[in-house]
Amino acid sequence: MQDIKINDKSPHCSKHVLPAVPSSEVYLEDCVKALKRYADNYFDLAIVDPPYGLGNRLSDGGGKLKNTPMATLYREKDWDILPTAEYWKELFRVSKNQVVFGANYFLEFLPNTRGFVCWDKKQDMPTLSACELVWTSLDKPAKIMKKSSMDLDRFHPTQKPIYVYEWMFKYCKTQENDLILDTHLGSGSSRIAAYKGGFNFVGFEIDQEYYEKQEKRFNDFKSQLLLF
């Protein structure tokens, strides 16, 4: 984060330097409607993990995940459907660059790119995917990211560890004070990673339960920072 000097004109003000705190704004709101408020190229980077009908795959009688622990932990949600063409149009309009997790579900909406990332999840469970395709708008060689998908205190079906987002920010060469967008905030891992990196952040979450849980997670994270 950038350092800023506090006002030292007052004799009662100590002359030390404090780190600038990145902004972090999150809204309980439908992201498609919200994005219409923003100008073209408003965000430096959009890093998104849109829904792809996970609830249907967990609950369908023929689904491979039906009898797994994941199926009992996460229930089907009304919003858990594939994004519309309008969503993708707005996403590309308001952001300069984009990162899309689960890209194989959305290829009809994504332009050709060489900047794919294959996330090796180091996953041993045969009923879960061993890897995930991540689409980026960057003109860079494809990479393999070897990071475990396991996360403590998991409360969202597609929750990703904070260090996965930190890796992606480095791959994208994100700069301090860049403005990050996450349209489907979920567990809030992207928000915490952005805060740690000194990036400004705007996120949207339509589900009140997840909104409240990620808010608590973020505030707990900030409280831990104050202890050191």
Positions of PLM-derived features:
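Class I S-adenosyl-L-methionine-dependent methyltransferase catalytic core
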Residues: 1-181, 188-228
